[in-house]
């Protein structure tokens, strides 16, 4: 079902099947729309554009992460030039002139929704699409409340990872579609079969060898802290234990929640790069920063890994901008071409850096802050991916890996995640986070009926650490 107006060829047969299923769901009498949950890199965007051509509607709103507004607009203009598209940035607080023809499609970032007044909420939309729809999984946020309030006949959620932390997330996303919470909780399997379409790269390769992606080799690089790092980590970890131990004795911890979060942040900073911790404490105490002069096992290892493959482009996903600064400085000293995207890089500047990386030298490195560029980027030019520290959710890392390991990739992709190991007397928070990932991956696997998700991030230690609370993380 490739519409004649679509200026590209759909990959047969799965994208044809996807467009057919979506078109039928849009015409369904009960809760038109649903979840398109194809694995990262299988073309959810082009399938959605094709569906809009098959079932044309006057007013479609697409809500996306801020970092990929431009990409959506570009893809629509490229693949469906017959459609009118308008990027709403929220700055002028108004839609196109009322005297002008209303655009077929409005693309807006999630970040504009909570601002008041938001004209998007005043329009009766024919179709609302949430790309990376897991962004609204918390029902208490303004973004979720406003998305729920949007007036629309058809509602879509696009996400390769629609469940992050618990079954509640799935129930919340179903509620956006209009499906009652009680029904979702009682009939999860029925909901999945009727409203969720998910295909994986492995599934497609079994039916068509031409669609088989090259191998993705994922391994943890387990590191031991150098003596100076271990000494600092022990000190900060012990302080965190004291904070958690003290607060856990209180009847209510709400008023001291920030202390708990800061305790976790500080140990993560030490494990990422000790200078981050020293700078953070100096800022908090309004004192002069102390310079860390004792090296970093993680930074040294990352440089060695990058230098050992001088003919392969690499993506390096980071958590903190200070960490990115250190990596960038080290790479520049080694005369390695380096580009970066963090939360401060937007619009044309972002697209320019992507273009520079794509056309750059074979040993180019792209530094990406995982929350700013972990979704929506097509970077098949890279064949090596480095994750400098584990993320809370496995989905975040899967999204990042999917920037390189996706349709159009012709070479094997190597993924290395750097993680500090610990010991019984001094547990590693990074190892605890990986065990938390395992629990969340099981939830995704259950709801999407995809058991492979349980092991999609391999080499998680078999000895389970039930890190449901900071008390468990700090071994209190």
Briefly describe each language-model feature range.
Residues 1-9, 13, 23-32, 45-47, ...:
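SF2 helicase/translocase NTPase motor core
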Residues 41, 111-114, 134-137, 162, ...:
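Catalytic acidic motif of RecA-like/P-loop NTPases
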Residues 47, 54-56, 209-229, 251-366, ...:
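Conserved Helicase C-terminal RecA-like lobe
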Residues 124-125, 172, 377-390, 414-417:
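A short beta-strand element within the Helicase C-terminal
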């Amino acid at each position: 079902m490739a519409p004649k107006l679509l200026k590209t060829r759909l990959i047969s047969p799965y994208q044809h099947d996807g467009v057919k299923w979506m078109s039928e769901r849009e015409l369904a009498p009960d809760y038109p729309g649903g979840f398109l949950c194809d694995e990262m890199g299988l073309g959810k965007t082009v399938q959605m554009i094709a569906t809009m051509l098959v079932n044309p509607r006057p007013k479609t709103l697409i809500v996306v992460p801020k970092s990929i507004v431009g990409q959506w607009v570009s893809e629509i203009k490229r693949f469906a030039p017959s459609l009118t598209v308008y990027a709403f940035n929220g700055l002028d607080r108004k839609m196109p002139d009322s005297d002008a023809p209303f655009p077929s499609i409005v693309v807006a970032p999630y970040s504009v929704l909570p601002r008041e007044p938001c004209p998007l909420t005043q329009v009766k939309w024919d179709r609302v699409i949430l790309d990376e729809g897991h962004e609204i999984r918390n029902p208490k946020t303004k973004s979720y409340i406003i998305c729920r309030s949007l007036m629309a006949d058809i509602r879509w959620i696009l996400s390769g990872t629609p469940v992050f932390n618990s079954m509640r997330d799935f129930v919340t996303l179903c509620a956006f579609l209009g499906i009652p919470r009680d029904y979702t909780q009682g009939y999860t399997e029925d909901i999945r079969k009727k409203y969720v379409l998910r295909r994986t790269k492995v599934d497609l390769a079994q039916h068509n060898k031409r669609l088989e992606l090259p191998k993705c080799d994922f391994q943890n690089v387990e590191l031991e802290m150098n003596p100076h790092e271990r000494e600092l980590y022990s000190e900060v970890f012990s302080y965190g234990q004291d904070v958690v131990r003290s607060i856990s004795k209180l009847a209510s911890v709400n008023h001291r929640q920030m202390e708990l979060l800061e305790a976790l942040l500080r140990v993560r900073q030490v494990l990422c790069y000790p200078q981050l911790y020293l700078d953070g404490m100096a800022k908090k105490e309004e004192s002069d920063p102390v310079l860390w002069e004792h090296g970093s096992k993680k930074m040294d290892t990352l440089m060695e890994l990058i230098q050992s493959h001088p003919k392969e482009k690499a993506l390096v996903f980071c958590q903190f901008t200070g960490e990115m600064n250190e990596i960038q400085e080290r790479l520049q000293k080694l005369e390695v071409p380096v580009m970066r995207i963090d939360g401060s890089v937007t619009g044309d500047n972002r697209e320019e850096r992507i273009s520079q990386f794509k056309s750059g030298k074979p040993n180019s490195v792209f530094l990406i802050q995982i929350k700013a560029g972990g979704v929506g980027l097509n970077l098949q030019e890279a064949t090596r991916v480095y994750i400098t520290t584990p993320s809370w959710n496995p989905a975040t890392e899967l999204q990042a890996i999917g920037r390189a390991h996706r349709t159009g990739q012709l070479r094997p992709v190597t993924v290395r995640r750097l993680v500090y190991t610990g010991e019984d007397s001094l547990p590693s928070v990074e190892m605890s986070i990986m065990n938390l990932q395992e629990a969340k991956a099981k939830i995704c696997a259950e709801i999407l009926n995809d058991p492979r998700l349980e092991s999609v991030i391999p080499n998680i230690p078999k000895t389970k650490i039930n890190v449901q609370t900071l008390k468990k993380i700090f071994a209190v």
